[in-house]
From Swiss-Prot:
Residues that bind GTP: 106-111, 258-261, 305, 307
Outcome recorded upon mutating residue 69 to F: In CMT2A2A; uncertain significance
Protein's name in the database: Mitofusin-2
Region G3 motif: start-end pairs: 199-202
Listed result of changing residue 109 to A/T: Does not affect its ability to cluster mitochondria; when overexpressed
Residue ranges, annotated region (G4 motif): 258-261
Consequence the record notes for mutating residue 744 to M: In CMT2A2A; uncertain significance; requires 2 nucleotide substitutions
Catalytic activity: GTP + H2O = GDP + phosphate + H(+)
Phenotype upon changing residue 94 to Q: In CMT2A2A, CMT2A2B and HMSN6A; pathogenic
Organism in which the protein naturally occurs: Homo sapiens
Annotated phenotype, changing residue 230 to A: Loss of function in promoting mitochondrial fusion
Localization, UniProt: Mitochondrion outer membrane
Tissue specificity note: Ubiquitous; expressed at low level. Highly expressed in heart and kidney.
Length: 757
């Protein structure tokens, strides 16, 4: 593909060169025209390129999302280059080839110009002398007009006579004045090729040669000294060109020995005179001025008759033979000499004008293109370095994000397990401590001091205060046993969480973690609710004789079985005999098998049933005992029994009732509290779990904020990298475009500025 592109470029270049050579062969002046068109096109492209570069640099400089990749100085430099290129483009658009004709008065300067233009454009001949500088250039219009110096007024000059009359009537014109003669291009083809012809007054009529040179000669590409072949070069003519040579480096000077047709009258002296003129002119150009080599001097000195050439060309333009009329001998030779001068002049001025008008600007354009290319290369490198840095930062943040996610997952699993272990340990500690406190409940109840009275109203208040005392005492004792250890364990776990998650947070947040994570003073709430728990407690503070029938049965059988025995019924349910044993390896139990307790209940129940059936049973038993021990022992027993009854009855005071009440309450409360041991342990473990989970949740919230910040930074980095990548592409494109413009300038230099080999 690159080979094909290279071949295409080569073909295009060859075609351009061929077209260029064809134009040059057609007219040497086309060389300047094509060069001007080419350089103007290059500067137009250069201006558009610098405008694009300036806009790009300014937008990049003002992009707040980017770190600086260009400087304000670079932006101002490129804007300065833009103004310079625009100024040069305006100058190039006005550039043209300029030839200045100088010589003594009436040497035929205007006639030479008219002969070159194939028409009587400037007044010449007898009675007409040029009294100011005349600048002849083409115009696209169809009417000729004059422009005087310092005025935009167009003065009509349709014919040479009108022009001559206008010039002589204007009294303000002096030798140093400039009048522009704008002549239609359609009438003079030579003017189409950006050629300006400068006619001048005779250099022998003024002493203001220095001001003439400064004003009219510094931008001239070729100087033509029109000399009179009937005399030698005058010192005035030499002096003027010495001054020109001092102000300009190696000016292009042609010497026309005009009126050479006069030599035809003396043919025997023609060659001798020609040789003398050639030697003197060559010596002047080579030895005195040093503007050409001796080998090149022959191409700068010509012997012509401008009047003959002008007349011949006017006749040819009118359709008549150019050799018609009375012509001196040797006309064709002099015509050929004039044509040879024109050819050499055109070649010289086109080469010289291209070099003097375009070379400096071409060099400046190359410098500007190179400067902008270096700026674009600098921007490209800065953007590339910043992109690499952003990619490293993005990768670092991505790694950080992955580390946080992985570490958070591991820590969550670890802390979940540890929280479970701590809650189980808390439940075990609370359950153990509560069981021990229940066993010591009687001590706590005995510590309760309040006036006791068996009336229902006082008992209700007594119970409520006892409930409060029990709940506060149990809570205090449980707190002394468990809270300190549990709180220490919880705080240790919280600190471990903070230490574990702190590395996942930014450095700026780590020092503020204690303020970001709320850590309130934790205390266990045991929530025993003794008033509700013991709401069904029913005290029994009525007097009961210790050896009474009810108390004895209650003592031996317990409250439940004594009630069954005293009520006189048997609620025993006969066990059915299964058809098949539940366990084939074990034989079925016999139907009459009873436990020892059931056997005792059955005996006493039977006895009670017997005594309840008939009062005769008492007499029978009493008679049996009477016969066995005697009446004295029976009387003594009844006496002691009665004394014991009286004693217990007398000692059944309010204090005794209070002790009975507290004993009954301890038994009832112990039974109820045993039922809530598991619940209380679970409740405390749940409180610890909630506290630890809340701490971990707050820490995770801070980690989530860090993750969100990292994700936002990664997204910003991605956007920034995308912008930087676009900047690099644009900067690279503009850098390469500068290289392309440089190659265009090099091609222009090779085609138009380097001398042909």
């Amino acid at each position: 593909m690159s080979l094909l592109f290279s071949r295409c470029n080569s073909i295009v270049t060859v075609k351009k060169n061929k077209r260029h050579m064809a134009e040059v062969n057609a007219s040497p002046l086309k060389h300047f025209v094509t060069a001007k068109k080419k350089i103007n096109g290059i500067f137009e492209q250069l201006g558009a390129y610098i405008q694009e570069s300036a806009t790009f640099l300014e937008d990049t400089y003002r992009n707040a999302e980017l770190d600086p990749v260009t400087t304000e100085e670079q932006v101002l430099d490129v804007k300065g280059y833009l103004s310079k290129v625009r100024g040069i483009s305006e100058v190039l658009a006005r550039r043209h080839m300029k030839v200045a004709f100088f010589g003594r008065t009436s040497n035929g300067k205007s006639t030479v110009i008219n002969a070159m233009l194939w028409d009587k454009v400037l007044p010449s001949g007898i009675g007409h002398t040029t009294n100011c500088f005349l600048r002849v250039e083409g115009t696209d219009g169809h009417e000729a007009f004059l422009l005087t110096e310092g005025s935009e007024e167009k003065r009509s000059a349709k014919t040479v006579n009108q022009l001559a009359h206008a010039l002589h009537q204007d009294k303000q014109l002096h030798a140093g004045s400039l009048v522009s003669v704008m002549w239609p291009n359609s009438k003079c083809p030579l003017l189409k090729d950006d050629l300006v012809l400068m006619d001048s007054p005779g250099i022998d009529v003024t002493t203001e040669l220095d001001s003439w040179i400064d004003k009219f000669c510094l931008d001239a590409d070729v100087f033509v000294l029109v000399a009179n072949s009937e005399s030698t070069l005058m010192q005035t003519e030499k002096h003027f060109f010495h001054k020109v040579s001092e102000r300009l480096s190696r000016p292009n000077i042609f010497i026309l020995n005009n009126r050479w047709d006069a030599s035809a009258s003396e043919p025997e002296y023609m060659e001798e005179v020609r040789r003398q003129h050639m030697e003197r002119c060559t010596s002047f150009l080579v030895d005195e001025l040093g503007v050409v080599d001796r080998s090149q001097a022959g191409d700068r000195i010509f012997f012509v008759s401008a009047k003959e050439v002008l007349n011949a060309r006017i006749q040819k333009a009118q359709g008549m033979p150019e050799g018609g009329g009375a012509l001196a001998e040797g006309f064709q030779v002099r015509m050929f000499e004039f044509q040879n001068f024109e050819r050499r002049f055109e070649e010289c001025i086109s080469q010289s004008a291209v070099k003097t008008k375009f070379e400096q600007h071409t060099v400046r354009a190359k410098q500007i293109a190179e400067a902008v290319r270096l700026i674009m290369d600098s921007l490209h490198m800065a953007a590339r370095e910043q992109q690499v840095y952003c990619e490293e930062m993005r990768e670092e943040r991505q790694d950080r994000l992955k580390f946080i996610d992985k570490q958070l997952e591991l820590l969550a699993q670890d802390y979940k397990l540890r929280i479970k272990q701590i809650t189980e340990e808390v439940e075990r500690q609370v359950s153990t401590a509560m069981a021990e406190e229940i066993r010591r409940l009687s001590v706590l109840v005995d510590d309760y001091q309040m006036d006791f009275h068996p009336s229902p109203v006082v008992l209700k208040v007594y119970k409520n205060e006892l409930h409060r005392h029990i709940e506060e005492g149990l809570g205090r004792n449980m707190s002394d046993r468990c809270s300190t250890a549990i709180t220490n364990s919880l705080q240790t776990m919280q600190q471990d969480m903070i230490d574990g998650l702190k590395p996942l947070l930014p450095v700026s947040v780590r020092s503020q973690i204690d303020m970001l994570v709320p850590r309130q003073c934790f205390s266990l709430n045991y929530d025993l609710n003794c008033d509700k728990l013991c709401a069904d407690f029913q005290e029994d503070i009525e007097f009961h004789f210790s050896l009474g029938w009810t108390m004895l049965v209650n003592r031996f059988l317990g409250p439940k079985n004594s009630r069954r025995a005293l009520m006189g019924y048997n609620d025993q349910v006969q066990r059915p005999i299964p058809l098949t044993p539940a366990n084939p390896s074990m034989p079925p139990l016999p139907q009459g098998s009873l436990t020892q307790e059931e056997f005792m209940v059955s005996m006493v129940t039977g006895l009670a049933s017997l005594t309840s059936r008939t009062s005769m049973g008492i007499l029978v038993v009493g008679g049996v005992v009477w016969k066995a021990v005697g009446w004295r022992l029976i009387a003594l027993s009844f006496g002691l029994y009665g004394l014991l009854y009286v004693y217990e009855r007398l000692t059944w005071t309010t204090k005794a009732k209070e002790r009975a009440f507290k004993r009954q309450f301890v038994e009832h409360a112990s039974e109820k509290l045993q039922l809530v041991i598991s619940y209380t342990g679970s409740n405390c473990s749940h409180q610890v779990q909630q506290e630890l989970s809340g701490t971990f949740a707050h820490l995770c919230q801070q980690v989530d904020v860090t993750r969100e910040n990292l994700e936002q930074e990664i997204a910003a980095m991605n956007k920034k990298i995308e912008v930087l990548d676009s900047l690099q592409s644009k900067a690279k494109l503009l850098r390469n475009k500068a290289g392309w413009l440089d190659s265009e300038l090099n091609m222009f230099t090779h085609q138009y500025l380097q001398p042909s080999r």
